[in-house]
Swiss-Prot record:
Range of residues in the leader sequence: none
Coiled-coil segments: none
Protein name: Peptide chain release factor 1
PANTHER family: LD18447P, PEPTIDE CHAIN RELEASE FACTOR APG3, CHLOROPLASTIC
Keyword Lipid metabolism: no
Function of the molecule: Peptide chain release factor 1 directs the termination of translation in response to the peptide chain termination codons UAG and UAA.
Pfam families attached to this UniProt entry: PCRF (PF03462), RF-1 (PF00472)
Gene: prfA
Post-translational modification: Methylated by PrmC. Methylation increases the termination efficiency of RF1.
Keywords: Cytoplasm, Methylation, Protein biosynthesis
Subcellular location: Cytoplasm
Length: 364
């Protein structure tokens, strides 16, 4: 393990912070400030796993020191051999734990614990691209439900032949962004479309964007930059459909962003939803601009969030999903049904390896 003294110093600092937060939670005056209490609870929870791992590491190191003393003092060859075997086992456990702690000490993305807006846009391929966008939407809904997250349709633009020209899902739950952020990019499908009469394989694409939730204070929006029109909602619904103007179309003039919302029951709710989506999109643009400035000299292979980055190909003929960032293949029929945890964990592991390599370069 590199720089053990530095690691211990960092862990001691984290432990002190954790203990301070624990003490603050016991302050009765905190009950009158629920927002501050929630902030402290979240901060403490974010440190808990690291503190527990550090405590375990200290106990194992103490055991190892005791066994080393036993090996030095023991006169009986058989007992010394048993102690040496125990020492070897402890060394292996400590090494594994140090690897785990190293990962825990890697800088965290400040957005990792946030909920997200997941946007899917049909790309090249016409009707088939829109149908594929619908397939991806179902894949993410099933994955989210399997994770225990909640999913709500925020905005949609259905296509005539099925699927969507564009669809936005609001996904809420524990550490949603930390997993879904690796899904951002271009997804490509190779298959025979339902509209194809001669059995030829077509290639189509859809683009996925993962945008973390933002508070109003995070993004300033000038009301004069917004143009809002209302229309009657279309599609299935109750008596209000096509009679009351509940649908909202919002245009943000400086960025050219268009948002159409009709999923909520009232015009006021749809306007609030459109503003929420606009804030998320503007924040995403700001974050990507900052990321490009910081990483202009060195492009990460995993998790750049670049909209133009081709990340996967879904080949139906061979029942194969290829992740181009990882150069790995996965089974398509299970992945498209929402079983993508293995794909996501592989991307997370690759990103962590990159972080470790970068850390080694910077400290070398």
């Amino acid at each position: 393990m590199a720089s053990p003294d530095l690691m211990v110093q960092k862990l001691n600092d984290i432990e002190r912070t954790y203990n301070d937060l624990t003490t603050r939670l016991g302050d009765p005056s905190l009950a009158s400030n629920p927002q501050e209490m929630l902030r402290i609870v979240r901060m403490r929870a974010g440190l808990e796993r690291t503190v527990e791992a550090y405590d375990h590491w200290q106990r194992l190191c103490a055991e190892r020191n005791a066994v080393r003393q036993m090996i030095r003092d023991e006169q009986d060859p058989e007992l010394r051999e048993l102690a040496e075997e125990e020492h070897t086992g402890l060394e292996e456990r400590i090494a594994r734990l140090e690897d785990e702690i190293t990962l825990l000490l890697l800088p965290r993305d400040p957005n990792d614990d946030k909920n997200v807006m997941l946007e899917i846009r049909a790309g090249t391929g016409g009707d088939e691209a829109a149908i594929f966008a619908g397939d991806l939407m179902r894949m993410y809904i099933r994955y989210a439900e399997g994770q225990g997250w909640s999913v709500k349709l925020a905005s949609e633009s259905p296509a005539e032949m099925g699927g969507f020209k564009e669809v936005i899902l609001e996904i809420r739950g524990e550490s949603v962004y930390s997993k879904l952020k690796f899904e951002a990019g271009v997804h490509r499908v190779q298959r025979v479309p339902v509209t194809e009469t001669q059995g030829r394989v077509h290639t189509s694409t859809a683009t996925v964007a993962i945008m973390p939730e933002v508070e109003e204070v995070d993004v300033e929006i000038n009301p004069n930059d917004i143009e809002i029109t209302t229309t009657r909602s279309g599609g299935a619904g109750g008596q209000n459909v096509n009679k009351v103007e509940t649908a909202v179309h919002l245009v943000h003039k400086p960025s050219g962003i268009h948002i159409h919302c009709q999923e909520e029951r009232s015009q006021l709710q749809n306007k609030a939803r459109a503003m929420q989506i606009l804030r998320v999109k503007l924040y995403d643009i700001k974050q990507r601009e900052q990321h490009e400035q910081v990483s202009g000299l060195r492009r990460s292979q995993v998790g750049t969030g670049d909209r133009s980055e081709k990340i996967r190909t879904y080949n139906y003929k061979d029942n194969r999903v290829t992740d181009h960032r990882l150069s790995q293949n996965f089974t398509l029929n299970t992945a498209i049904e929402g079983e993508i945890e293995t794909l996501i964990q592989s991307a997370i592991a690759a990103a962590q390896r990159e972080q470790l390599a970068e850390l080694a370069r910077s400290s070398g």
